[in-house]
Amino acid sequence: MPNIEIKARCNDLKKARATAEKIQTAYLVVLHQVDTYFSTKAGRLKLREINDKSAQLIPYVKGYQLAPMKSDYAIMLVENPTLVKDLFNTLLGIEFVVDKNREVFLFENVRIHLDEVVNLGTFIEFEAVCADNSEQEHRKQETKVANLMKIFN
């Protein structure tokens, strides 16, 4: 499943929250997420534990750059995250763990994440879900993300 995304440091989450409210986003939820990243030869593989209640295995591939980028990913529900984490640690090794509190807003098809990450700081992320994998759709979503970057400064 493709999306267009960008993540950046955000020194003022209060201001970002006010901007999200101003443009009339839908406020979805506050989440506590612990992402365990496993060592891979290509792309990334993470186990995301959400609010100590559910978990997802998320493999993805993206080109890292300082602009909106395409990411191809899949989300697989995990029933036993402890077992999965132990098995993937044995098979691949753990690269790092990211512990964050995330506020999620929705503007049209773009998820806006306001993140407080333990030991790393505060961030904002825009994820525009693509309707298909065409170049035209990618450009359309890149434009949406670029516009939000301007709005949120």
Residue ranges and their predicted role:
Residues 1-110, 152:
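N-terminal strand-loop-strand beta-hairpin
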Residues 135-153:
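Mixed-charge, glycine-accented linear interaction segment located at domain edges/termini
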